[in-house]
A protein has these predicted regions:
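Cation-handling catalytic/transport regions enriched in His/Asp/Glu
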Residues: 1-284
């Protein structure tokens, strides 16, 4: 923080210079501000800036109070005066879910889950298994991460990940399976650029699959308490993502609709957003 603080003046100056470039881009294209220019450039026709502001308000009034209740429970469980940022990462029950032993158990469990969602999904994932299109287990020297990659020649998807026997591996495979089902669904499109989904919808199929499959996670968990923990963690994780998402988006909206602001005003506005969307975490 000391190093960043010492460079604040320089970083603020660079920010202002880059902001002015974007403002000129928007004005040269005939738009009042850069936000409206980007909405048009990105082809966003299904929602407006006003819809986004309404989304911010909905999160503030519906999600934030619930997250504050959760953090109140966390504060009481940890027996601390306030929940600090590092307290949010503590698993309160200290139980690590280990739902499978090897990649064979993982893939077979995922196939059973997908069959309960839609039999065709299970058949496609089983085809990937039989065709060698799954590289799931962690091993020495293997690249980190996880992804689904559509293969251009065969039009089939390939899933890569690093499973080590934890619950997050189940979610990762189901997530990437959502991408894979999307790949199968679009494989007959012949115009290659049409296959490239824009970033704001690229995760719909994958994250949607995470939630569509939650009712069937019992294929991995025979203990009801483990199943409830897995589901609760999934739902809480989704809700906890929203405050920071709103802060970043609201900040960008304000930056470009208030082009004459100073660095000091920018700091004050960001601090206000941190307060507005604070789920009960003490950052002092």
């Amino acid at each position: 923080m000391e190093t960043l603080g010492s460079a604040k003046e320089e970083l603020d100056s660079l920010f202002d210079q880059l902001k002015e470039v974007r403002i000129r881009q928007a004005h040269n294209a005939g738009f009042e501000n850069y936000r409206d220019y980007k909405h048009r450039e990105l082809g966003r026709f299904s929602y407006s800036p006003e819809d986004i502001m309404a989304f911010h308000d909905a999160v503030e009034h519906e999600v934030i109070p619930f997250l504050r209740e959760l953090n109140q429970e966390r504060r009481d469980a940890l027996e601390v005066e306030s929940v600090r940022p590092w307290d949010t990462a503590v698993d309160l029950d200290g139980k690590t879910l280990k739902p499978f032993g090897d990649s064979e158990e993982l893939i077979n469990g995922a196939i059973r889950i997908l069959k309960d969602v839609k039999e065709g999904y299970a058949a496609q994932l089983e085809m990937m298994k039989n065709s060698g299109l799954l590289d799931l287990e962690n091993r020495k020297g293997k690249a980190p991460g996880g992804y689904n990659y559509p293969l251009a020649e065969t039009k089939a998807p390939f899933i890569f990940m690093n499973a080590v026997g934890l619950h997050r591996d189940v979610v990762t495979l189901l997530h990437e399976s959502g991408h894979a089902m999307h790949t199968f669904a679009t494989r007959d499109i012949t115009i290659t650029p049409y296959l490239h989904t824009p970033s704001e919808v690229a995760e719909l199929a994958s994250m949607g699959m995470e939630f569509l499959t939650m009712d069937y996670w019992g294929h991995f968990y025979s203990d009801p308490s483990d199943l409830n923990k897995a589901r609760r963690d999934q739902l809480e994780g989704a809700l906890k993502f929203l405050p920071w998402c709103m802060i970043v988006d609201a900040f960008q909206q304000w930056i470009y609709t208030h082009p004459g602001h100073t660095a000091e005003e920018r700091d004050v506005y960001f601090a206000g957003l941190m307060d507005r969307f604070n789920p009960g975490v003490d950052w002092s």
